[in-house]
Regions:
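PLP-dependent amino-acid enzyme catalytic core
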Residues: 1-397
């Protein structure tokens, strides 16, 4: 049974193992609130998962260690287990979904683990890990539904209260629920009036649906850029703890996640993965009541694959009004392209791509013009659109 003493013991055990990440004041995230970030993306291995994994491994018996450990993960728990096992001289095997970011797969190998890639998502990797555990006798290290793991993650809650004693709101990502379970339990045990909110991706709301239906729900599928929280079913322990100690759960869209990643990069010079940015997205887009409150957003991880980072940035620019694509139906005559470009330039838009297409079967005297431009914000986009319409141009999209 999880107790506050368990979390204090975990904190002591992890004293020389993990980095106690400092809070970062980030007022630009939401100018109506006092926002602080808990940057666990700066943790060793790039996420909070190191805490729970290392504490669990430190509590294993010698017999359990001798059998080697096996774990399943979307990527971050894998790295925590791999590093923790290697430090203790223990053999480790990690089951990862085939779609896990290459950066997470390679990092897991570098930390000393063997890797088994499994078709599907996290839950499929979980079933494969259980199968191999039975066949080979490994000791299983659950990524979230284990009281030692939860206690390890709960050390973040202790740190938050030490760093900002008068905190009023804490926002935490939710996948399987290990992080928020430990953090919420620690916070509510020591400061019952603090509000704790969980955030899930809109495409993977397993804990939200479970809480709403008052029983654990297993989703048929999950789809989100936030691979670290793409979990079909929450754990038994985590569901019970969230039911008791979490004040509310919200979801954020893919575009909101991308906008949050971009904001963290530009404003705070922090790299967050999708799962790591959902708490910030919830604060940015007022998904939880933070107005006038001292609020901490847990940035849970930063292990984003650089091959998809450019796409994330592109969507973030679109979401924040920093990039705009417009398609116009023009008369095919000299000067039309120049006329459009002149309006955009006069209003401060910066055209970075032009596609001029004459192949319009419906009207031989017409053509399409598609422009991609850099803009300042949504109001700037509206100004450019209105100017084009007032000049007599037809906007298709």
């Amino acid at each position: 049974m999880l107790t506050l003493d368990c979390i204090y013991r975990a904190s002591f055990a992890l004293k020389n193992v993990i980095r106690r990440t400092d809070l970062i004041y980030a007022p630009q995230i939401n100018n109506e609130s006092q926002i602080y970030l808990k940057p666990e993306n700066l943790q060793y291995t790039g996420s909070f998962k190191l805490r729970g994994a290392c504490y669990k491994i430190s509590c294993l018996t010698e017999e359990e260690k001798s059998r080697g450990v096996i774990a399943c993960s979307a990527g971050n728990h894998a790295q925590g287990v791999a590093l923790g096992a290697t430090k203790h001289g223990i053999k480790s095997l990690i089951c990862l979904p085939e779609g896990a970011p290459i950066s997470k797969v390679e990092a897991t190998k570098r930390y000393g683990a063997d890797v088994c890639l499994v078709p599907g998502v996290y839950d499929d990797a979980y079933q494969k890990a259980l199968q191999l555990k039975e066949e080979k006798g490994y000791t299983f290290i659950h990524p979230f539904d284990d009281e030692y793991v939860i206690a390890g993650q709960g050390t973040i809650g202790l740190e938050l209260l030490n760093q900002l004693p008068d905190v009023e709101v804490v926002i935490v990502p939710i996948g399987g629920g290990g992080l928020i379970s430990g953090v919420a339990y620690a916070l509510k045990s020591l400061k019952p009036d603090v509000k704790v909110y969980g955030v899930q991706a809109q495409g993977a709301p397993s804990m939200l649906q479970s809480i709403e239906h008052e029983r654990r729900e297993c989703l048929s599928s999950v789809s989100t850029i936030a691979d670290g929280i793409a979990v079909k079913e929450p754990g038994e322990h985590t569901f019970d703890l969230c039911s008791k100690y979490v004040d509310g759960i919200v979801t954020v869209t893919e575009d909101e996640i991308c906008a949050a990643i971009l904001a963290l990069m530009e404003q705070q010079k922090l790299i967050a993965e999708g799962a790591g940015a959902v708490a910030v997205a919830a604060a940015m887009f007022n998904k939880v009541p933070v107005t006038g409150k001292k609020t901490i957003c847990v940035v849970s991880g930063g292990n984003i694959d650089v091959t998809i980072l450019s796409r994330v940035i592109g969507r973030g620019l679109d979401m924040s009004g920093r990039s705009y694509t417009v398609t116009l139906d023009l008369h095919d005559k000299p000067g039309e392209l120049m006329g459009v470009a002149t309006i955009v330039a006069r209003l401060g838009g910066n055209i970075i791509s032009v596609l001029h297409e004459r192949n319009n079967n419906s009207n031989v005297t017409a053509c399409f013009l598609r422009l991609v431009m850099e803009t300042r914000n949504a109001e700037h986009i509206s100004l450019i659109r209105n100017a084009l319409l007032e000049a007599g141009y037809t906007i298709v999209n």
